[in-house]
């Protein structure tokens, strides 16, 4: 998820909770260029992805599980790097093993399938495969990734394995493992280590052993293109592509680096190099990380969302929205980083006051009146329609569950009727004018 920090271009009532919990329990129970395709695991030209991210599990994020970070000390660590550094390896491993084994379980995958989803994006950090010198991180995540893929197979879900964090940080966001400096390209050692990790990752997960489940390897999540050397990034993508091909036939996913649409049309282009095939561009879309977006009316939010799909439909590569949200504010606790407030109420970023965050800081169902639910539902439907338009390959919501938020929590949003059931149900059809 995008956390544009450092000026970079990312108590409920019992009766309400019971109603939502009951809904959730019943849900869980119940002009395109023709690109050469050499693997039958997924047809990006015709099949559509309806997916969800498993955030805050194998890569920690303070806004998803704030209790983990608050339990360390009064001096709350801001990311997984500082979390493990503060606890030391032995205690960090003990706590993370408990988190990994309880935060996501088999029943979650059953719930995803029952909700009509067909896909899961699973973030994992480089440190699950190799450590850089001096890293405080602990390992053990691969065991749980393996379990997740087994559960995907059991419930008919496809998956991407997403390298979410690189040494030195590719974006400075806490979800890269280390908040602050964007140091990934500062030394060739960091990039080289990332390439080595990709080799390990693709040799294990990119071959035939997982071809019934894995329909993509994402080379790197959200490299921040405006702060990185573009030529070096393209070189990394080329190397990563070749590693995937050396180890198997999995589709290769490259992130758009938050650069304009069409930036990567001539990167890994089949028409320029017939040996290149099955490359997908991953776009992430949010309207909550700048004051201008937060100030928009619901009609403006819908119009912006519709424009995404129209533009990306004309890109050379097939594209997919690998992260999006129902959120119309940045009010969720620590969304902008541990210890930080929100732009919406002017407690972060130094901008103008837009509105109160009092009822959105944590999961307060009283805020979600019929009118509020209607606005959120309109926005969600517009995004879904946009990301499914034309050759756009689908969408992956961020994220499946959180401790304390509603705007970012698919399970709670399903219970409120903000995310449609079935997923193609429309209360506000054809908002984008595509038909």
Swiss-Prot record:
<dbReference type="GO" id="GO:0009251">
    <property type="term" value="P:glucan catabolic process"/>
</dbReference>
<comment type="function">
    <text>Beta-glucanases participate in the metabolism of beta-glucan, the main structural component of the cell wall. It could also function biosynthetically as a transglycosylase.</text>
</comment>
<keyword id="KW-0732">Signal</keyword>
<dbReference type="Pfam" id="PF00150">
    <property type="entry name" value="Cellulase"/>
</dbReference>
<dbReference type="GO" id="GO:0009986">
    <property type="term" value="C:cell surface"/>
</dbReference>
<dbReference type="InterPro" id="IPR018087">
    <property type="entry name" value="Glyco_hydro_5_CS"/>
</dbReference>
<keyword id="KW-0378">Hydrolase</keyword>
<dbReference type="GO" id="GO:0005576">
    <property type="term" value="C:extracellular region"/>
</dbReference>
<feature type="disulfide bond">
    <location>
        <begin position="331"/>
        <end position="357"/>
    </location>
</feature>
<keyword id="KW-0326">Glycosidase</keyword>
<feature type="signal peptide">
    <location>
        <begin position="1"/>
        <end position="30"/>
    </location>
</feature>
<feature type="disulfide bond">
    <location>
        <begin position="306"/>
        <end position="432"/>
    </location>
</feature>
<comment type="similarity">
    <text>Belongs to the glycosyl hydrolase 5 (cellulase A) family.</text>
</comment>
<dbReference type="InterPro" id="IPR001547">
    <property type="entry name" value="Glyco_hydro_5"/>
</dbReference>
<dbReference type="GO" id="GO:0071555">
    <property type="term" value="P:cell wall organization"/>
</dbReference>
<protein>
    <recommendedName>
        <fullName>Glucan 1,3-beta-glucosidase</fullName>
        <ecNumber>3.2.1.58</ecNumber>
    </recommendedName>
</protein>
<dbReference type="InterPro" id="IPR050386">
    <property type="entry name" value="Glycosyl_hydrolase_5"/>
</dbReference>
<keyword id="KW-0865">Zymogen</keyword>
<dbReference type="InterPro" id="IPR017853">
    <property type="entry name" value="Glycoside_hydrolase_SF"/>
</dbReference>
<keyword id="KW-0961">Cell wall biogenesis/degradation</keyword>
<dbReference type="GO" id="GO:0004338">
    <property type="term" value="F:glucan exo-1,3-beta-glucosidase activity"/>
</dbReference>
<feature type="active site" description="Nucleophile">
    <location>
        <position position="323"/>
    </location>
</feature>
<keyword id="KW-0964">Secreted</keyword>
<keyword id="KW-1015">Disulfide bond</keyword>
<feature type="active site" description="Proton donor">
    <location>
        <position position="222"/>
    </location>
</feature>
């Amino acid at each position: 998820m995008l956390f544009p920090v450092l000026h970079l271009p990312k108590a409920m009532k019992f009766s309400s909770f019971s109603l939502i919990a009951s809904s959730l329990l019943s849900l869980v129970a119940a002009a395109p260029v023709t690109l050469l395709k050499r693997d039958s695991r997924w047809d990006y030209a015709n099949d559509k992805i309806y997916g969800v991210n498993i955030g805050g599990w194998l890569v920690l994020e303070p806004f998803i599980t704030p209790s983990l970070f608050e339990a360390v000390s009064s001096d709350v660590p801001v990311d997984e790097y500082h979390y493990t550094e503060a606890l030391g390896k032995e205690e960090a491993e003990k706590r993370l093993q408990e988190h990994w084994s309880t935060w996501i379980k088999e029943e979650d995958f059953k719930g995803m399938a029952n909700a009509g989803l067909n896909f899961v994006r699973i973030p994992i950090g480089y440190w699950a495969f190799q450590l850089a010198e001096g890293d405080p991180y602990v390992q053990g995540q691969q065991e749980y990734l393996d379990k997740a893929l087994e559960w995907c197979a059991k419930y008919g879900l496809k998956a991407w394995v997403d390298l979410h964090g690189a040494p030195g940080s590719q974006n400075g966001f806490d979800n890269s493992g280390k908040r602050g400096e964007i140091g990934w390209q500062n030394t060739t050692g960091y990039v080289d280590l990332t390439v080595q990790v990709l080799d390990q990752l693709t040799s294990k997960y990119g071959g035939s052993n997982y071809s019934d489940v894995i329909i993509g390897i994402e080379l790197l999540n959200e490299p921040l293109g405006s702060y990185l050397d573009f030529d070096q990034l393209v070189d990394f993508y080329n190397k990563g592509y070749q590693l995937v091909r050396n180890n198997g036939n999995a589709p290769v996913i490259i992130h758009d680096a938050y650069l304009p649409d069409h930036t990567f049309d001539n990167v890994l282009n089949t028409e320029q190099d017939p040996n290149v095939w099955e490359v997908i561009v991953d776009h992430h879309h949010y309207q909550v990380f700048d004051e201008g977006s937060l100030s928009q009316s619901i009609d403006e939010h819908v119009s912006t969302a519709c424009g995404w799909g129209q533009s990306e439909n004309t890109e050379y590569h097939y594209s997919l929205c690998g992260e999006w949200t129902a959120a119309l504010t940045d009010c969720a606790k620590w969304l902008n980083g541990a210890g930080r407030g929100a732009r919406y109420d002017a407690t972060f970023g130094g901008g103008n006051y837009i509105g109160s965050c009092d009822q959105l800081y944590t999961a307060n169902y009283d805020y979600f009146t019929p009118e509020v639910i209607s606005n959120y539902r309109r926005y969600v439907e517009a995004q879904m329609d946009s990301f499914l338009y034309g050759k756009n390959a689908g969408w992956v919501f961020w994220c499946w569950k959180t401790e304390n938020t509603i705007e970012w929590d698919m399970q709670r949003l399903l219970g409120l009727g903000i995310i449609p059931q079935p997923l193609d149900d429309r209360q506000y059809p054809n908002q984008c004018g595509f038909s």
